[in-house]
C-alpha cells in the first residue's frame, strides 16, 4: 500500500492554519463536540457552531479574524450520517472542518482570493480542475471570480433558488427563517471526464465527477419575518472545507478511506480482526467509528442509555457488530486507540492525554455488549425467518432495542445487508408510546422560554449577586407564565419575572437557583421560589405574587435568602476541593460529569471505572478536610480563556465559556466557575461523605454534606453508635469487638442448631414412615412438622424419597403462624398420574396460600389454622382419585 507523504492530513492541517495566521487570523482551538449552552444541538456538526452567538449578536469577540480546525460529529438528531458510514466514499461520523472567519472585517474579495491562493499556490491544485458556483443574483462574487481571480466564465455556475422557495438554494445560506443570512460561493474539484457526473446545477450533479471542497458563506443580510432582506451593518465571512475530502484530492485518491490517516487505521483494524482484504467495508466502519468514539469520550461523553451517551453507545455497538461479522469474539475495538493517537495525537494533545481513559471506557463497553450482541443476533434471526415481505416489524425492532439493548440503526444495518428493511413508522410509534407512558410533568417555570424575537429586544441580565444579596431599582423587562408572555399579573399568579439586573443567582453549573423576595414600595410582594436561566443569558425569577400586582416596567427591590445562599456556597466550594482530591487520588481521567449544589447537600458525579474502596474514601475525605483546616483564601479572578488554561484551570464538561472567564482558586484547586463561593475554605467547617455509588458505566457519584449539616450527620451517627452499644450491652469504644464476639457466638449456635435439626429430622423420618398410608401400592405421607423451615423440610423430603420408592409426599412446616409446603411424587406407579405442582395447589388453596413447581417437586406456603389439618387429612383421598 502506497501512502503519499507530500500532503499528509497532518501537513494539510498545519498548512491551512499557517496560511491564515500569516493573513492576520487568530488561531483558535477546536470547540468540544458537545456544544455548551445550546440544547437545540446534540453535537457540534459544523465549524460555525462555536461562533453562532457572534453571528446572532449575543457575543462579542475581540478578534475580528479567526481560523480553526473544528472537530465535528454527525451521528444523531437532524444531521445523522451513521447509516451511510462505511458504504459510501465520503460519509463519516467524525470529521474535521477547516474554516476561516471574519466578524465584520474583510469580506468577499479577500475570502475569494485567499481561497484561490491556498488551493492553487500552496497546495498546487491545477486551476483548470476547479469550478465555482455563485448565487444567481450575487454579481459581486461572480465578477471577483472572473475578473480578479481569472476563472473562465464557463467554469462559473450561477445557482438559483433550487429548493422551491425564495432564497431556498444550495448557494444561499440561512441560520433560520429569520436572522443572519447571505449568498455563498462553492469551489468544486473536477475529477475528469472518466468519472460519471455533471457540474453543479445540471441533472447529473449527483455524480462523483465534481466534488465540493470549499464553501464560502457571505453573511450580509438580516432576514425579516416578512421575508425581506436588510443589509447587515458589518457583514461576516464563514468558510468551511472538509479535511478528509480535501486530503483525498491532494493525495490523488477517489475516496476518503484511501487517504493516509484512514489507511493507517484500516490496516490496524485489519490486523486486530485478522482480515486480509483491506477493502472490506467493515474495516472502514471500524476505522471511522474509532475516531468518533475516542473524541466523544475525550470531550466527556460516556456510554449511556440516553442523549449523547446513547449516540456514543450506538456508534460503539455498530463497530463491535462489524467486528462480530468478521468473526471477532473478543474485545478488540479499544486497541484501535494507540494507532489513532499515533496519527492524530500531535494535532490534538487532549487525545494523547486521555488515551488510557478512552481505552478503558471502550473495553468496558465491549465486555458489556458481548452477551447482548450474541442474544440480539439470535432474536433478529428468529424474527427475520418469520418475515414474508422483507420488512422487520417495528414492534420487533422496538423489542430488540428496549429489551436487548439493540439500537434500531444496528437492526436496520443488519436488515439492509440481508436485503431487508425495518418498519420505522412502527418503531417510532412504539417509541412514542413508551415516552408517553414514562413522561412526567415538569416543574413550573422550567419549560417556559422566550421567543428569539423577544430575546433579541432584551439585554442580558446583569448579575449583581457576587457582591450583594439585596438590590433596589430592578426594572421588570418581561413577565412569563405557562402560557407565554404577559404584560401584568396579580395576587395568586405564578409567573417568571425578568428584570434588567438581579442579585438572584440563576441555576447553572449544578448550583441551585436562589430564593427570596421581590418587593415594591407600594406593598407589592412576590415570593421567589427558584431562579432559572433562560436562553443562557436571562435570569428568570420563578415567583408567586402574595400581595398586590406587577406589570412590565415596574421597579422592584430584591432580597436573596441569605442563610440559604451561604449554605449553597459552602457546598459549592466543597465540590471544588472534592474534585481536586479525586484527581489527586485517582488521576487526571477523573472529570466532573455533573453536580448538584444545594443548601443541604452536594452531589458530585465523575468519571471513574470502579467502586471506591473504604480506605480511599477515608483518604479523600481527609484530603478535603485538610484543605478546609488550612483556611485558604478563596481567590476569584477574571482573565482570558487561554491565560486561565495556561494557569492550569480546569474547564468543566458541558459548560460554555466566553473569551473572558472567572477563575476560582482555593489551595491547589483552580477551576473555571461562575458560581458563588465562600471567602475562606475554613468557612466549610467540616466535610463528610455520606454515600458513594455508580450511576452509569464509567461514572461514579459521591454525596456529601458540609458545615452544620455535616456536624448533624456526625452527631446522628454517634447517637446510633450509642444506641447499638446499649442494645448489645457494650460501651461505644468496644462495640466492634463486642459485635465480633456476638457474631462468632451466633455462628457456633447456628452450627449446633443444624446438628440438632439433623437429629430431629432423623427421628421425624422414622415417625413419618410409620404414618404412611398405602394407596394402590403407593405410599402416601401427609404430615405437619412444627418448627421446621423450608430448608429442613426439603432435607426431610429427600430422606423420605430415598426410603420410599413409590410415594406421594406432602410436608407442612409450621413456624410463627406461617406454613411452608413441599410436595413430591416418587416412582413409576405414581409418576404421570399424580403431579406434585397440582397437588401443592390443591393443598395451598385450602390454607390461603399458593405455590408452584414441577410434576415431581413443588413448593409454596400458606397460613396456619384448622384448615391445615383437614387439607392434610384429605391428601390420601385426593391421591386415590388420581391414581384410579
From Swiss-Prot:
How the cofactor is bound: the record states: Binds 1 zinc ion per subunit.
Give a GO biological-process term: alanyl-tRNA aminoacylation
Q: Which UniProt keywords apply?
A: Aminoacyl-tRNA synthetase, ATP-binding, Cytoplasm, Ligase, Metal-binding, Nucleotide-binding, Protein biosynthesis, RNA-binding, tRNA-binding, Zinc
Q: Which cofactor does it need?
A: Zn(2+)
Keyword hit for Transcription regulation: no
The record's GO CC annotations read:
cytosol
Quote the Pfam families the UniProt record gives.
DHHA1, tRNA-synt_2c, tRNA_SAD
Q: What is the name of the protein in this document?
A: Alanine--tRNA ligase
